[in-house]
């Protein structure tokens, strides 16, 4: 499907980021930002999901609200192609946790038509990038930090409700 295309830095196994995610969970739990137990359980489930075995597919890799432009309540454009490449489509499930709520997430999942393992890995990407946004931006960019907090809350709640 994407033969010869460059791999995305976010197209590999979500579990490859285990050390960084666990360190961020610990750091953010220390100041009360996250529940370490719930976040770790969410992360473990994502890492235990079956890996992507299909052909690499094109992916944006950074589909969070600041990169999704809307007009009249509808998606009008996608911007910031800095991590564009190929790999596991799970990373592009990111809007399910960075943008949506439980009710709208179900509609997104149905439209995306992905298997359970891809969804679980996608949830892991949501948690990972949410933790990263809070860690990096909480003092400098309140909008991205809020997106990160939303992703963490939604990923953990989605895991708890699964």
Residue ranges and their predicted role:
Residues 38, 58, 146-147:
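Alpha-helix N-cap and coil->helix boundary residues
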Residues 83-86, 94-162:
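Helix-rich C-terminal or lid/interface subdomains of diverse kinases
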Residues 36-47, 119, 123:
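Short, well-structured alpha-helical segments
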Residues 20-24, 92, 133:
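A general alpha-helix detector
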Residues 1-4, 32, 50, 72, ...:
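A general structural signal marking secondary-structure boundaries and capping sites
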Residues 43-93:
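Active-site acidic catalytic loop and adjacent metal/ATP-binding pocket
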Residues 1-37, 50, 54-56, 86:
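A cross-family kinase active-site recognition segment
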């Amino acid at each position: 499907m994407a033969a010869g295309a460059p791999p995305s830095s976010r197209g590999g196994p979500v579990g490859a980021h285990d050390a960084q995610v666990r360190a961020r969970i610990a750091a953010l739990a220390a100041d009360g930002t996250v529940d370490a137990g719930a976040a770790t359980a969410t992360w473990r489930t994502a890492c235990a999901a079956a890996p992507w075995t299909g052909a690499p597919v094109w992916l944006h890799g950074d589909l969070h609200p600041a990169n999704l432009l809307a007009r009249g309540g509808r998606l009008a454009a996608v911007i910031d192609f800095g991590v564009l490449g190929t790999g596991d489509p799970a990373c592009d499930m990111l809007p399910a946790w960075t943008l949506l709520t439980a009710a709208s997430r179900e509609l997104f999942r149905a439209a995306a038509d992905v298997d359970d393992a891809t969804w679980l890995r996608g949830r892991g990407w949501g948690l990972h990038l949410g933790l990263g946004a809070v860690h990096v931006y909480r003092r400098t960019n309140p909008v991205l930090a809020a997106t990160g907090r939303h992703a963490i809350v939604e990923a953990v709640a989605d895991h708890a409700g699964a």
